[in-house]
Amino acid sequence: MTPIFFNQQYPTLVDICARWQLVYDANATFELRFESDTLSLHKRDEPKLDGIVVDFVTGAVAHRRKFGGGRGQSIAKAVGLKQGVMPSVVDGTAGLGRDAFVLASLGCTVTMVERHPVVAALLEDGLRRAYQDAEIGDWMRERMRLFHGSSLEALSKLAQEIDVVYLDPMYPHRDKSALVKKEMRVFQSLVGADLDADGLLAPALALATKRVVVKRPDYAEDLDGVKPNTVIETKKNRFDVYVKAAMK
């Protein structure tokens, strides 16, 4: 059970917290609010920080969907997206769902796995609003879902073939941009660094039939010390690709 502060007079919040096994704690560091049909997370000792929400409909993710470079993006190349090939992807470290959304918007079917229940609650709320949206709702319902389990091992019990497992473990950020500082400060204090990130690679390789893609900061070592088959570099990050079989 995860402690959280919330207004116990709001049935919606009570239901969300019960669903994700979040227990009321008057002294909790974090608060969940439900305002304007949106679930948001707030750090109570930093009231000036905006709440964190998952929003697939407006803002930065919507802009990236429209103007982000389509299949020419490095992430699309990394997962093997090409003409006639629409891989099924498991995002094993979903976070706020941004990379998963990019892949879904390009045609992949994406299953998100998020082990922290507060983050999972935010993701589910973001999906709920996206599913209702007139512009993106139809394909979002078809291509993007949240798995109600906390591990890749749990997902492997489902009898469905997964082409690609995508991992973006939490790594200490050097980036000093305001957004990264704000979101990462809140996020890392909530979920902590992925100290067991190296343990994600083996189950990912067991689950994926075609490849595993690991997003890393450019200064980070290889996950679990395993050298990838190929690397796709961007300005600040890289995608390490572990190939098991050809995409077709």
From Swiss-Prot:
Q: Where is the signal peptide?
A: none
Annotated Gene Ontology cellular components are: cytoplasm
Which controlled-vocabulary keywords does the entry list?
Cytoplasm, Methyltransferase, rRNA processing, S-adenosyl-L-methionine, Transferase
Tell me where it resides.
Cytoplasm
User: Could you tell me the EC number(s) of this protein?
Assistant: 2.1.1.242
Question: Where along this sequence does the record place binding of S-adenosyl-L-methionine?
Answer: R98, D99, E114, R115, S150, S151, D168
What Gene Ontology molecular function terms does this protein carry? rRNA (guanine-N2-)-methyltransferase activity
Q: What InterPro entries does this protein's entry cite?
A: 16SrRNA_methylTrfase_J (IPR007536), SAM-dependent_MTases_sf (IPR029063)
Q: Tell me where it mainly resides.
A: cytoplasm
Which reaction is recorded as catalysed by this protein?
A: guanosine(1516) in 16S rRNA + S-adenosyl-L-methionine = N(2)-methylguanosine(1516) in 16S rRNA + S-adenosyl-L-homocysteine + H(+)
**Similarity comment: family membership:** Belongs to the methyltransferase superfamily. RsmJ family.
**Functional summary from the UniProt entry:** Specifically methylates the guanosine in position 1516 of 16S rRNA.
HAMAP family for the chain: 16SrRNA_methyltr_J (MF_01523)
Specify the protein name: Ribosomal RNA small subunit methyltransferase J
Q: State the encoding gene.
A: rsmJ
